[in-house]
A protein has these predicted regions:
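Conserved donor nucleotide-binding strand/loop of the catalytic core
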Residues: 330-341
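N-terminal glycine-rich phosphate-binding loop and ensuing alpha1 helix
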Residues: 4, 39, 268-320
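Acidic helix N-cap motif at the loop->helix transition within catalytic regions
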Residues: 321-328
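Conserved alpha/beta core of the MobA/IspD/sugar-nucleotide pyrophosphorylase nucleotidyltransferase superfamily
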Residues: 268, 272, 418, 422-462
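Well-ordered secondary-structure scaffolds
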Residues: 2-267
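Conserved hydrophobic helix-helix packing surfaces used for dimerization/oligomerization
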Residues: 8, 270-272, 368
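Conserved beta-loop-beta/alpha segment of the NTase-like Rossmann-fold superfamily
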Residues: 340-419
């Protein structure tokens, strides 16, 4: 099956965001971008943010145009171009309903993006945690890891020191010397010498700190603050670098495209099933309602699934509270009124429903992930990594593990569906795992993630 065009919202329209747009647009996806009313993009000749104050911006073979509303944005996309809309809070999410959101604002902190904002969410640069704020993070720091996709954790923290280009780092920057309005004295593409006045800010001169070509400069008339980056100088002094997407932007765009392709190829091909019908015999009461860090265990388990809107999610339970919580989170509830028959019944009920739904939708499942409610330390990023591993290892069983200990979640390839449907009594998939050790792939996790709550005393270590 060929790739299907997805709707992708890029928050931010600066030069790096434009590099990301270039990769995604070239791959055939439908792109829309947001920005603030007065963009502060230094490399504005290669940034779609320029469309905000010029109405249109052409970068290489792409054209972006300012859209004032939904109707204009849709018309621009229909014509094959990229709409840029002034929408700092990205309220357009409500009507655009993107498949993917890329936060490329590059504020060095998260300004409000949530992992539940779209089926797949990517954070660009520091300030995001994969599995908490977004599904993955793309590294933006120059060097060996530039453009890497991070599925667990964060990008390298901002140091405040720009990367080395042509042997220069701090010297490359042109910074405002005072608060006030900027009046450029050099334009993008000009060759300048160290000590030359390149701008006036707040009536104070700004001097070049090195020889080279002005690669970026803010537009005239913008209000700036002292110390703000208003331009940059490139020692390589090549005119074409001023009007083409940078190597850094392309590398970051490549990382985003890798992540998007990974999601695109796996979405809808796996189902997630939460087993929540147990009797909690050893616990002495309903352990799924036990509170860990201010939240009932069943609630935190359901909330993990909310981060994976690209996959159909099921909750097998016979409990009213859990049913209501699951339905409000968009999960399909599969009723199990006979939990005394053991975990095998929940496995079979959930798997049967998932297979039926997939067949009805014409998208046969490649695998199913089973999770449980009593692992309060399980991270969303672990579920994501298990799905990724399963996609790249067809025919395998993939589970979380630490050292010699393996545990939930477990993702079963479709070739094991028949064996799972043959389970009986209070026997889960461990028997099948033992018989198919050669087919097992382990996703390493921290030991705390594997801890399950069986007895009340376990709560003290959770």
């Amino acid at each position: 099956m060929g790739s299907i065009e997805m709707k992708i919202l890029i928050k931010g329209a600066g030069d790096l965001a434009t590099g990301i747009a270039s990769r995604l647009y070239g791959a055939g996806h439908q792109i829309m971008m947001t920005d603030i009313a007065v963009p502060l993009t230094v490399r504005r000749l290669v940034a779609f943010s320029r469309a905000v104050y010029e109405g249109e911006a052409v970068v290489e073979d792409m054209t972006a145009r300012l859209a004032k509303n939904q109707e204009e944005a849709e018309e621009i996309m229909e014509q094959g171009d990229i709409p840029v809309i002034v929408d700092p809070k990205a309220e357009c999410i409500q009507w655009f309903q993107p498949d993917v959101i890329v936060d490329a604002i590059l504020a060095k902190r998260n300004l409000g993006t949530k992992i539940t904002d779209a089926p797949f969410v990517i954070g660009v640069g520091p300030g995001f945690i994969a599995g908490e704020d977004c599904n993955c993070v793309v590294e933006t720091k120059r060097g060996h890891t530039l453009g890497n996709v991070i599925w667990d954790g964060s990008a390298i923290p901002n140091t405040g020191v720009p990367g080395n280009v042509g042997g220069y780092s701090i010297e490359r920057l042109i910074k405002a010397s005072a608060d006030g309005v900027i009046e450029p004295k050099a334009v993008i593409g000009d060759l300048v010498r160290k000590g030359q006045i390149v701008a006036i800010t707040g009536g104070e001169p700004v001097y070049a700190l090195m020889d080279g070509i002005v690669r970026g400069m803010l537009q005239p008339g913008v209000q700036v603050t002292k110390g703000l980056k208003i331009g940059d100088i490139d020692a390589r002094a090549k005119q074409e670098h001023c009007r083409t997407i940078s190597d850094k932007a392309r590398a970051i765009g490549g990382g985003v495209l890798d992540a998007v392709c990974s999601y695109e190829k796996s979405r809808g091909k796996y189902a997630l099933i939460l087993l929540a019908a147990g009797q909690s015999v050893r616990f002495g009461s309903d352990k799924l309602k036990a509170v860990v860090e201010g939240e009932a265990m069943y609630e935190s388990a359901i909330s993990r699934f909310e981060a994976f809107q690209g996959f159909k999610s099921y909750v097998v339970t016979g409990k009213e509270e859990i049913t209501l919580s699951a339905e409000s989170a968009g999960c399909t509830v599969v009723c199990n009124k006979e939990p005394e028959k053991g975990i095998s019944l929940s496995v079979k009920l959930g798997l049967t429903k998932a297979i039926e739904d997939a067949d009805e939708n014409g998208t046969p499942l490649r695998g199913v992930l089973f999770s449980v409610c009593d692992q309060p330390r399980l991270k969303k990023s672990t579920i994501q990594r298990i799905i990724n591993t399963a996609f790249h290892n067809p025919g395998k069983i993939v589970c979380a593990g630490e050292g010699t200990r393996n545990g939930n979640p477990v993702l079963w390839d479709k070739r094991f569906f028949d064996k799972l449907l043959e389970l009986d009594g209070d026997i889960g998939g461990k028997k099948i795992l033992k018989e198919n050790v050669d087919s097992l792939k382990i996703v390493p996790v921290q030991a705390g993630e594997l801890q399950d709550i069986d007895r009340k005393e376990d709560l003290g270590t959770a």
